């Protein structure tokens, strides 16, 4: 008896283009001709010109383009109810933290937290994202609900892969000093004990896991002590967990590292066991050439978050230089309180443009010694797709996720380019990244299951969800300390 006889089979037929998530090399192509893909169980079984088999489900992808489902490597889902908060709208990182996420965080009870998580996950799924890594730092001593369990539950309801980046802090900065008791730090023992609990309950080390747990102190430079950095790294590696945190999001990280430790943030992390192929950092906007070389040498990855970095005015991560040096690159949406377009299509569109603009800013006229006109070669569409799919899977160790290739997990986004913004494209394959906006998701498959059908998710009433969100925002505005 064949696998086909025992597992459900789906044939996606007649796609206009198939992007693979590959690097664009001869042995790792960025696109394949197809035009068909067969899914058997949770696996991509075949790609090519395929004949239907008796009894299998047929999905007509005529005029559609197919991508690997996006892999989002850094988010803060609880912030889905903090979009466009006026006090932080025009603030840089530090005053924004005090004005928005820290000011409102204590108001998130179980109901509000669950709603925020649901909104964020649905927003991501409807952009073609099937793997979400959430850097959750809503934890405090005596907390009356389990925020980690809620995140896993909501992701499972939608059929998405979920990686919990278990944040937290054992010490606070001055900006947190006068905030509510729900922002109290944890002890290191309590933090480690919860990591061990979560790992035992949820962590799956397999290469296409639906659930993972990651050791992720909120900010290694500020949230834990140098001694605790080494201790948390040792615990993570003992448990077989990866490691993640924020780093070098602004110049403030450089100032702090040099003033406190006399070295760069990346070098400091290296001296405290927080570099390696099992580590990736969000942002890394402000890094120098020596730091990039150290990241590459150790295999430490980056979650590039261009929209949040732009919204907060932090700068643009030097992704081109990182990729050229061999740093593993991925893409993250970051929290919606600093990125109101909290979906992966918006993020990859911005990645494509921002990297080109950054390189173009370095161009000089010939009389000043300039040798190039602009930065259009800084990021190709194929590279951006790779960073947002296979690149993300790589930094999280999901080795059978993130590519449209035979034998990989069947995480597939099928986009219908039926909006005028896509009309006139000479190469429809580039539409979702190059044209921006949110294309209609005709189908999103996660582990072989169709979780989005023509932009709809079974059991989700978007109108009702929007009404509930507006009610909770009004509640938050009434209760927050001005």
Swiss-Prot record:
One Gene Ontology term of the molecular function aspect: pterin deaminase activity
Enzyme Commission identifier(s): 3.5.4.11
UniProt keyword annotations, A-Z: Hydrolase, Metal-binding, Zinc
Cofactor(s) of this protein: Zn(2+)
Catalytic reaction annotation: a 2-amino-4-hydroxypteridine + H2O + H(+) = a 2,4-dihydroxypteridine + NH4(+)
Top-level taxon: Bacteria
CDD domains, per the entry: ATZ_TRZ_like
Residues engaged in binding Zn(2+): 74, 76, 246, 283, 334
Family from the record: Belongs to the metallo-dependent hydrolases superfamily. ATZ/TRZ family.
The protein, known as: Isoxanthopterin deaminase
